[in-house]
C-alpha cells in the first residue's frame, strides 16, 4: 500500500446467535473495501463519467460542459491539501475506479467549515461503496484538523445521499435553498457533522 492511499473496510454486524426476526446471518457477511487515492492527472475520464452524464448529475443542476470539466480537473489537481482534498474511489474487489469523494474549505454562516461531496458510478451504486468512501474521507478531514464542522448539502430529492448522511452520523440542521452550480438554485438539506465531538 502506498503511503498516500486510504483504505476503508465496513464489516456489517453479525449476531452471535439467532434472534427473533433477525436477518439471517448469511446475508450480513459481505465486506466492503475501498481505497481512496489522491486525484491525479489521469483521472479526467472518471470526472467526465461523473459530471458529464445527465443521469449522474440529476441532483446537481445537470451535466458540465467539456470546458467546465477541464477547469475542474485542473482545480482538483492543484488543490492545496490545507484547503481540501480530492480522492478517486477504487473498489478493491474489482480494482476499478468507482467514483470520487472530496472535501474542501468554505465559509458557511460566518465561519470556516469543511464541505463534503461524493459521487459513485451507477455500476457501483447500492453496494455500500459511497458509505465506505465517505467514512474514510471524514476520517481524513478529522485528521487534517483545521475545522470543527463538516457539512453536506444534498438535494432534498436525493434520497440515497440524505440517507447516507443520516447513517454516517450527520445531524440535519435545516432545509434551505442552495446555489450549485453557480447560478442554479436548488432545495437542499444542510447536514452537519461535528468532527471533534
Predicted regions and their residues:
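Active-site rim helix/loop that mediates acceptor-substrate recognition in acyltransferases
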Residues: 65-83
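Helix-loop element at the rim of GNAT/NAT acetyltransferase active sites that forms part
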Residues: 49-63
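Acyl-donor (CoA/ACP) binding surface of acyl/acetyltransferases
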Residues: 3-45, 49-52, 86-197
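Generic structural signal for secondary-structure transition and capping sites
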Residues: 55-56, 78-82, 146
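A short, aromatic/hydrophobic, helix- or strand-capping loop or linear motif
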Residues: 59-64, 83-90
